[in-house]
Amino acid sequence: MEMTADYLRDRAWQYAQLTRLNRPIGNFLLLWPMLWGLWIAAKGLPDLKVLVVFVLGVLIMRAAGCVINDYADRDFDGHVKRTTHRPMANGRVSEREALTLFVVLCLVAFGLVLLMNPLTIALSLVAVALAATYPFMKRYTHFPQVHLGAAFGWAIPMAFAAQTGAVAPVAWLLFLSAVLWATIYDTQYAMVDRDDDLKIGVKSTAVLFGQADRAIIGVLQGVMLAVLVAAGLVVGLGAFWYLGLAAAAALFAYQQWLIRERRREDCFRAFLNNNWLGGLIFLGLLLDLHLGG
């Protein structure tokens, strides 16, 4: 096929959609927990090289995760209202293109992590395995959201390893909070697709929880906040940290109000609201580390 400007422009747009460059919310949901971990590991002053590598690595691996997700779901997405427009669902990107792009993105991310220490490099192999296997979990288990949380949260122990050369116990508390958080917001996200998922046999926590979804999400929200309180106690954080958590609790209450009738658009709004929640927790951490004395 002739490489005309129009063709290249079209390919770039298809790949941008495939990697969700047009939907940056996922970038933030990945970045916030990593930033919590890195700032706590560094006591407020992260190494610039580590910060740059991790921000770029998170963005690249999120793009790779979106690609392999669409590859795995290529036969399902055409039957789900929200995903019928995706490039693989309507044949605008081939399977070979998608797999090639996934491999290239993973290699670029691995090239970045090679700038880090051996422990971080070893942990990165787990990150790739989690990212590559997550999209297939919905065929075999009702808990793909938990797997997603592990994939999203794995940047936390990696950040500790890169910054300090070790993974402190508090890193695993933060990792647990990230798993819980992803389970919360991805269940809200899955509530948008629940009717379609039931028809085509796709598993999710939203399908499993059924009418108990709001109550279970509420329990998970409470446990997540308790874990973050424990993390703050372990490292001696002060008032600003807990003010950030109080703000997060208020947003969790708002999300419960949004999903009260389980309308698709309101469940999606609750999902999007988590970006503000992650940012407020990070703001509380920043203020505490730099102004808390």
From Swiss-Prot:
Q: In which pathway does it act?
A: Cofactor biosynthesis; ubiquinone biosynthesis
Q: Which residues form a coiled coil?
A: none
One GO MF term, please? 4-hydroxybenzoate polyprenyltransferase activity
> Where does this protein come from, organism-wise?
Alkalilimnicola ehrlichii (strain ATCC BAA-1101 / DSM 17681 / MLHE-1)
**Pfam families, from UniProt?**
UbiA (PF01040)
Q: What is this protein called?
A: 4-hydroxybenzoate octaprenyltransferase
The membrane-spanning stretches of this chain are: 25-45, 48-68, 101-121, 142-162, 165-185, 223-243, 271-291
Under Enzyme Commission nomenclature, its number is 2.5.1.39
The GO annotation for biological process reads: ubiquinone biosynthetic process
What family classification does the UniProt entry report for this protein?
A: Belongs to the UbiA prenyltransferase family.
InterPro entries reported in the protein's UniProt record: HB_polyprenyltransferase-like, Prenyltransferase, UbiA_prenyltransferase, UbiA_prenylTrfase_CS, UbiA_sf
Instruction: Tell me where on the tree of life, at the top rank, the source sits.
Output: Bacteria
Protein task? Catalyzes the prenylation of para-hydroxybenzoate (PHB) with an all-trans polyprenyl group. Mediates the second step in the final reaction sequence of ubiquinone-8 (UQ-8) biosynthesis, which is the condensation of the polyisoprenoid side chain with PHB, generating the first membrane-bound Q intermediate 3-octaprenyl-4-hydroxybenzoate.
Membrane topology qualifier: Multi-pass membrane protein
Keywords on record: Cell inner membrane, Cell membrane, Magnesium, Membrane, Transferase, Transmembrane, Transmembrane helix, Ubiquinone biosynthesis
Q: List cellular component terms (GO).
A: plasma membrane
Q: Which PROSITE patterns match?
A: UBIA (PS00943)
- What does the record give as cofactor? Mg(2+)
User: Per its UniProt record, what Gene3D superfamilies does this chain match?
Assistant: UbiA prenyltransferase (1.20.120.1780)
User: What subcellular locations does the record give?
Assistant: Cell inner membrane
Catalytic activity from the UniProt record: all-trans-octaprenyl diphosphate + 4-hydroxybenzoate = 4-hydroxy-3-(all-trans-octaprenyl)benzoate + diphosphate
Record-linked PANTHER family: 4-HYDROXYBENZOATE POLYPRENYLTRANSFERASE, MITOCHONDRIAL, PRENYLTRANSFERASES
Q: Does the keyword Mitochondrion apply?
A: no
